[in-house]
Regions:
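Conserved short alpha-helical segments that host acidic/polar catalytic motifs at enzyme active sites
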Residues: 1-249, 264-294, 333, 445-450, ...
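Glycine-rich oxoanion-binding loops at beta->alpha junctions
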Residues: 66, 70-83, 273-287, 311-347, ...
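Structural motif
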Residues: 67, 95, 295-297, 343, ...
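Acidic/histidine-rich
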Residues: 152-186, 462-488, 523, 530
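Generic C-terminus detector
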Residues: 252, 542, 555-557, 567-608
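Active-site phosphate/pyrophosphate-binding segments
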Residues: 259-263, 267-297, 387-515, 588-608
């Protein structure tokens, strides 16, 4: 949700912190701030709004400070305001804290501190941490932080500095990501490796209940029992974390156009064409358990939930597994029977989604096999799961997911193919699926070559305030994902429905001012969705159809069509969603919306 960046070393700190905030802004952008220490005095600057607002306030500030902390916020406790922005500080302005997460018992701690004479200025839970550290400080920041977090309930990533303790930064992780960057006589901490990539390729991913202590000459990591730990240093490909639009107007448009490459990255080195099977090294440690599993539960949130819904159809088509897909935030509260014969597959772009992590921990307690599909290497979900597969799609900066979604669908297909071949799928069927997967990048390029035509259609429909999206089978979740994209970035009301459910309510809304986007590609339910389209036309509803080239019946009913290439029905959603992404993008652009940073949303949802 929020973004944290910290630095201690010999370079001027403010340019480094500001660069880091810009790279982290997609995690939250309703306020921002920084605190630096120079000559034993803390200088703090905060601003409501985006990082550019903070940058404007810093334009006249001249500072030689070489250590500090900074934060970009997505509000959970307290409205977006300068007072509620981080860093937060104690009564004497010596302790400064940035925090990502939620402190569940902050009100009772706040009452205790008020009784001891502390005065609070903000509505945030974070300010409680600063006052608590101040209360416990006796010359040793490290000890004060350790003593303070003993009282905290909830999930958090915390960074703290004290103006009396030169060049020392103390960071703690519990349920919210903290990554340490190792430079030459300089050290960094951040909530995302994207912020560190320009400065170092050596990173350490903290696990829960670990603390890192950084200064300008060295660092060490310990657990909360005060024991020093030896952590593996990961060497990260910094090129994977480039934060460049590459000539596109928005990151989202760039990421839409990157999908031929990210699809290739998803299957490159992971298929054995001569055997009609996939090869997923990340699953090899558990393959004997996996191929004998009877039940698979897919858990995820948002766009990843819709990829999971399509994944259910794919697994049912290719394997003998009994498959369920659950919203992660609901999963942990249900009385589901979980044991060693059940696999739970978590899908998350960031690898840090709080609800998904909480659901995984519940499944782990009950003995299930834990699997993951994530894009964020070294993040919390891969650390928690027994095995998994990375997207290797590079950073997705636009808040509305595009390239990760289609990459997830390819990986789900590869996992289902792997299990299916163990369970009786023929070589011929496996080879057919592999051949179809290999064609996807060029088929996506073909769709993208028609972006100008899709833009013209989008502009035509940009005058409407409500949309219905309908689909069946594999394309029911595609309809929901298409509607979500439009809602997220254009703020237009849109609903995705199973087409067969239309007559059970949504059809009452249809008139000439309520258009429908119908996903009507060639599969066994095409005739059914054609009937639904006829019902819409009978009520003067306008229809934009996503269909295959040459589908005359669709063309005869729809007002407008966007044609996509044919592929296997289980892969067709990958192609069908591309024009839906572009359609949403061009409408939002026409409306002048902030496409990469839509209001009230954050890229990485690290609070429940």
């Amino acid at each position: 949700m929020c973004g944290i960046i910290c630095y201690t070393g010999k370079k001027k700190v403010i340019p480094i912190l500001m660069d880091g905030l810009k790279r982290l802004e997609y995690r939250g952008y309703d306020s921002a701030g920084l605190a630096v220490v120079e000559n034993g005095k803390t200088f703090m600057v905060k601003s409501k709004g985006k990082v550019s607002s903070l940058e404007a306030k810093l334009s006249d500030l001249s500072s030689e400070a070489t250590f500090g902390i900074a934060h970009t916020r997505w509000a959970t406790h307290g409205k977006p305001s300068e007072i509620n922005a981080h860093p937060q500080f104690g009564c004497n302005n010596k302790v400064s804290v940035v925090h990502n997460g939620i402190i569940e018992n902050y009100l009772e701690i706040k009452e205790e501190l008020i009784e001891k004479g502390h005065e609070f200025t903000s509505d945030t839970d974070t300010e409680v941490i600063a006052h608590l550290i101040e209360q416990n400080f006796n010359g040793d920041l490290e000890t004060a932080v350790l003593k303070s977090i003993e009282k905290l309930d909830g999930a958090f990533g915390i960074a703290a500095i004290h103006s009396d303790v030169d060049h020392k930064i103390v960071v703690v992780k519990r349920g919210s990501p903290i990554i340490i960057g190792i430079g030459e006589n300089e050290y960094f901490a951040a909530s995302d490796s994207t912020a560190l990539a320009p400065y170092t390729n050596q990173m350490i991913y903290l696990s829960d209940d670990e603390m890192a202590v950084l200064n300008s000459t060295d660092y060490y990591i310990k657990n909360l029992s005060n024991e020093i730990l030896k952590k593996k240093v990961e060497f990260v490909d910094s090129d994977m974390y480039t934060n460049d639009k590459k000539g596109f107007e928005h990151f989202m448009l760039k990421e839409i156009f990157e999908q031929p490459e990210t699809i290739e990255n998803a299957f490159r080195g992971r298929i054995i064409e001569s055997e009609g099977v996939s090869k997923l090294g990340g699953l090899e440690p558990v393959i004997d358990r996996l191929k004998n599993m009877k039940k698979l539960i897919i858990i995820s949130c948002g766009t990843s939930y819709y990829s999971g819904l399509i994944g259910r159809y794919i697994f049912e088509e290719l394997t003998e597994l009994n498959v369920e897909t659950e919203v992660a935030s609901e999963f942990r509260y249900r009385k589901l029977k979980l044991d060693k014969n059940v696999a739970v597959l978590a899908i998350s772009q960031s690898g840090e989604t709080a609800d998904t992590l909480a659901a995984l921990k519940e499944a782990k307690r009950k003995g299930a096999l834990l699997l993951g599909i994530v894009n964020g290497v070294g993040t919390s979900i891969p650390q928690l799961t027994d095995a998994g597969v990375y997207n290797h799609a590079g950073p997705e900066i636009g808040v509305a997911s595009t390239k990760i979604y289609t990459s997830q669908l390819v990986i789900l297909t590869l996992i289902a193919l792997l299990i299916g071949r163990y369970q009786g799928m023929s070589f011929t069927e496996g080879k057919e699926i592999i051949n179809a997967i290999k064609k996807l990048p060029d088929q996506i390029r073909e769709i993208l070559s028609n972006a100008k035509m899709i833009k013209e259609i989008a502009l035509k429909y940009s005058v409407y305030n409500d949309f219905l999206y309908i689909g069946r089978l594999f394309n029911f979740p595609t309809a929901m994902e298409g509607a979500l994209k439009l809602k997220e970035i254009s703020y237009i009301h849109a609903e995705g429905y199973a087409a067969g459910e239309m007559k059970h309510g949504p059809i009452s809304l249809i008139d000439e001012n309520f258009p429908t986007v119908a996903i009507a590609t060639d599969d066994l339910v095409l005739e059914k969705i054609l009937s639904n389209m006829e019902e819409i036309k009978a009520r003067d509803g306008k229809i934009l159809a996503i269909t295959n080239e040459g589908e005359k019946k669709v063309k005869n009913i729809a007002d407008d069509i966007i044609a996509v290439p044919r592929t296997l029905p289980l892969l067709q959603p990958i192609l069908n969603v591309i024009p839906l992404q572009l359609f949403a993008y061009y409408i939002a652009d026409e409306k002048g919306c902030d496409i990469d940073k839509p209001r009230n949303l954050a890229k990485s949802v690290t609070v429940e």
